[in-house]
Structure formats: structure tokens, C-alpha cells
Amino acid sequence: MFESKINPLWQRLILAVQEEVKPALGCTEPISLALAAAAAAAELDGTVERIDAWVSPNLMKNGMGVTVPGTGMVGLPIAAALGALGGDAKAGLEVLKDASAKAVADAKALLAAGHVAVMLQEPCNDILFSRAKVYSGDSWACVTIVGDHTNIVRIETDKGVVFTQADNAQEEEKASPLVVLSHTSLEEILAFVNAVPFDAIRFILDAARLNGALSQEGLRGSWGLHIGSTLAKQCDRGLLAKDLSTSILIRTSAASDARMGGATLPAMSNSGSGNQGITATVPVMVVAEHVGADDERLARALMLSHLSAIYIHHQLPRLSALCAATTAAMGAAAGMAWLIDGRYATIAMAISSMIGDVSGMICDGASNSCAMKVSTSASAAWKAVLMALDDTAVTGNEGIVAHNVEESISNLCSLACRSMQQTDKQIIEIMASKAH
């Protein structure tokens, strides 16, 4: 619709955002297994009787401690069971959105009977891997997802192979909407945000709608660690100031509380993560309200935030030892700085200060405590913006921060890609030892 009005680079950037910014119900690692189970069950005619599943260490890490929406239960087994018994394989990251109360009860009964097993895939060279084998009588179906939360690469049944992606994997990689990110820069992203027609990016306002609703739910209910609602009470007690900084902290935390606590509301995700989507959205929304931004300014700020977060995360493994709420918050820093100042120099300084501040935060699995890291990252982003507005930032003389923001980002991502791989293994070992 808009192709004739905008240049090809802008169109590719829009496609990259549409690829990476999608609604997701529930933490995306257990949801990936739920999708595999749902797709396997869809190949069978009879009643689901048993499920065997295998996942990569990173997916196990992010699935052990998080609540599956609508179940009140934690972990990968309930995700697999509910996916098979009540999931919609065509709904992607919203696979569980229409799961009925009966499906939840049946899934819990399947678990109680000991008919669901989730195991580590060994050996496993894929960071993101989930496989579900679903049995019905003498029939079975097996679905494998690799590389991305919804990327089904193989469907097989007792009658033979139904689908395999292996034959056209290289062509699909070349055609990926994310390829453009390897050939652009933050400065080009800012130029795009400033000039692209509003109607071409209006869709990003859905992120504000979905993640704003999660934030409101987090403040209403007692979800997860209820950080947002707890801090709101401390405001009423006079222990926290009722100001813009606190509002960013409370409203962003509340959305993650609801998300990780199992609220049956979708998040608008970023780079396959609901918490990253929340972190890239809610702080920008709060600042936009504060400055009286209209829908167009909000859309441009959100587009800058989400696209910057995608741009940085594209240089990382899909899952790693680095908490990606930090990189999503770098996007939020860009969006907030743009709303107040608009200069590239301010945005670059804010991101550099973020890299000098929170870059060492580890990911120790998806859980209610993710809301702590989301709130920390959002607060750090606002602090970095305030510093940048006064032309102050962590400089290239300090730590891993370089003299230009692109090199700083590269330094951060190289740590996650190389040095932090051993850290990730040790985190998984510690978590596995706790589970036994």
C-alpha cells in the first residue's frame, strides 16, 4: 500500500519491524514448545495420550520458572500439554489464546498421570530448539522448531515426513526481512523515523495498546512479584516521589509483572520476547504522555525504540547469558531521547551510557524476577537520557564503551556472542542443580 510512497530501504526496515514485533501470549520459550506440541497434535485424529519433548539448554533455562497463562502452573510440561490439548497451531506466539478451561483441566490431568516428559536435547548445537512428539494410540506426530520461536523446520508422523525446511533453508535466510539490519546504522534508522509517512508506521501503535493494557493489569492484580503495584503503594506512603522517573519504573514493572505472572493478555513482543517488547514500549509511552505527544509522535518514537532494539539484538544470539531487557531498554532510551530532544548525538550518548551501565546483567532464565531486570533497565535508560540531555555520557575512555556508538554496540554484542557462552553454561548448570 505504501511502497510507492517510500524508498526501498524504508520498506525493508518496516518489514523487519513487522517480523520482530508481534503479539505473544505467555513467555515465548514455553510458548515455542506449546506451538510444537499443538502442531504435532494437529497431525493426529485421535485423543492425545502422551507427549515426549526435547529442548535446548537455553530454552530449558527460560522455561523452568515461568507461569503459563491460564494455568497457574510453572514450566515446560504444562506448556506442552496445553499446547497439544488446547492450542491453535496457526496462531504462532498466541498458540494458547483460545485454550478452554476444559483443555487446561485435561492438560493438568495428563501431567498428573505422568504422561508428559520434557528432556534436554543432547547433543544440541542450536540455541533455540524445541521438539514435541505427541502420541495417540498407535499413531504419533513429531514437530521440531529451530532458530526462532515459531520456525517449524520438520513435521513427521508414523506414516512418514510431512514437511522439512532443510532443502530451502539457505534461500529463506537470504530472504529474511532482518538481512537489512546488517547493512544499516542507527543514524539511518533515525533518518527513516523522521521522514517515513505516518500511515506506513501507524501499526506500531498496537504495541502501546497491548503493552499498556498489560501495565494496567499489573497494577490492578497481584501478578508475579507485583513490583509495580508495590512501588505504587510506596508512592502513597511518601517513600517514592510521584514523578516521571517513578512513573516509568512503576508502569514498566507492572507490565512485566502481569506478563511473567501468567496474565491472559498478549504482550507485543520484540525479537521474540514479551519483556523486550514491554521494555521498548512502556517507558516511551510514559514520556510521550508527559510531553503531550500526539499519535504520530508516539508512533515515530516507538518505531525508533523498537527498531533500535531489533538492530542491537540482531547482533546477539537469539538467547544468551546477556539479559536482553538491557538491549531493549537501549531502544527505549533512543525513543525517549527523540521525544525530548530529537538529536542523533543525544540518542547515541544515551545508548553509550546504557552500555557502560547495565551491560553485565545476566539472563538466569525467564521467571517473575524478570520484572526486576525490566524495571532496572527502564530506570537506567531514563537516567542515560537525562545525562545525554546535558551532553554527558560514558565515554570511549571507559570500559567497553568506544568513541562511537556503533563500535560500543559491537563490543557489547561480541561479549555475548563469545565470552559469555561459558557464563551461560554455568548459569544452566546452577539452575539444573536446583531442580534436582
UniProtKB/Swiss-Prot annotation:
Give the PANTHER family listed for this entry. Answer: UPF0597 PROTEIN YHAM
What's one GO MF term for it? L-cysteine desulfhydrase activity
> Taxonomically, which superkingdom?
Bacteria
Q: Name one GO biological process term.
A: L-cysteine catabolic process to pyruvate
Q: What is this protein called?
A: UPF0597 protein YhaM
Report the transmembrane regions from the record. Answer: none
Q: From which organism does this entry originate? A: Salmonella arizonae (strain ATCC BAA-731 / CDC346-86 / RSK2980)
Its ancestry begins with: Bacteria, Pseudomonadati, Pseudomonadota, Gammaproteobacteria, Enterobacterales
- Family the entry assigns: Belongs to the UPF0597 family.
